[in-house]
């Protein structure tokens, strides 16, 4: 996703919250629960993508946590590590990632890393912290 696309998505979500009666400050804060500011999205790296199935979209559904009830999403979570992907913003890890649970957001980290992270139930921040500790001990 380009920076311009991220800006459009971010501004649209802020506008939706403003229309619901939130102040600008509140609307921006609520938007940041699920979207990063333009220029700060993992999508800009080419390593992250949002995956939802066609029936979900055709039913007029948005990117929402309830997507995790879909068989297609459950299959992705079960097999993602075989292809080097992780579920980037996992349920229960919101305080660590700073982003709400997103069952549609996947990030490529490589097969070996993905398998390790899945086995140990780590999000990227925790994995990086482990690597940094390992590297500091080897100095």
Regions found by a protein language model. Name each.
Residues 1-138:
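Cell-envelope/glycan interface and biosynthesis
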